Amino acid sequence: MMVSMRDMLNAGVHFGHQTRYWNPKMKPFIFGSKNKVHIINLEKTMTMFNFALFELKKISLRKGKILFVGTKQSASKIIKESAILCKQFYVNHRWLGGMLTNWKTVRQSIKRLKDLESQSQDGTFNKLTKKEVLLRMRELSKLENSLGGIKEMGSLPDALFVVDADHEHIAIREANNLGISVFSIVDTNSDPDGVDFIIPGNDDAIRAVNLYLNAVSKVIKKNVKNEK
């Protein structure tokens, strides 16, 4: 699955942020500016994205776990859909501090989530008062929202695929602390430090986000299929 220059142009991948919001560390990936908006060098993006896809393919071939991270509203839905499509994992609402670095505690919360799911299906809730049922349903909903995308992960992931490096800086820092590879879309306002596989590109436009995630999920899904 190769991504072409035409695909990226059509999706608006080259449009960065307003020049006044730029991060100077992104200078090597900027082509120029137009109407006070930075234009990203798509030749570099194409090379770096296709290399990232190649590396993600290698991880999935060895049955590695890839965690998709995109908690801002514009990315939330497609992050979940893409991860499910290629049988991987996701965090698409709030990133809970310690989600990776405090995995032992997170595992206990996942166990609680699974216990509540069982209780809601095995008749346990029928034996409780309405108030107790309501409290447990609220807890279940909250846990599902936060941990639903990682409840079957079982252990720490081998890599993170992040849509917005600036917005998800806590997740990136945690991955760095644990030596987990980070693949990320990095816009002109973001700090690329801590990202192992930088993909310079627009991280706001829905069409651009769709392009990235469609390519990534297809590469991984193909390998997951080939294992069967």
Swiss-Prot record:
Q: Which GO terms describe its cellular component?
A: cytosolic small ribosomal subunit
The record's listing under Gene3D superfamilies reads: Glucose-6-phosphate isomerase like protein, domain 1, Helix hairpin bin
Extract the PROSITE patterns matched here.
Answer: RIBOSOMAL_S2_1 (PS00962)
Keywords from the UniProt entry: Ribonucleoprotein, Ribosomal protein
A GO molecular function term, named singly, is: structural constituent of ribosome
Domain of life the protein comes from:
Bacteria
> Known InterPro entries for this protein?
Ribosomal_uS2, Ribosomal_uS2_bac/mit/plastid, Ribosomal_uS2_CS, Ribosomal_uS2_flav_dom_sf
Q: What does the similarity note say? A: Belongs to the universal ribosomal protein uS2 family.
Q: What is this protein called?
A: Small ribosomal subunit protein uS2
Q: Which organism is it from?
A: Buchnera aphidicola subsp. Baizongia pistaciae (strain Bp)
- Give the encoding gene's name: rpsB
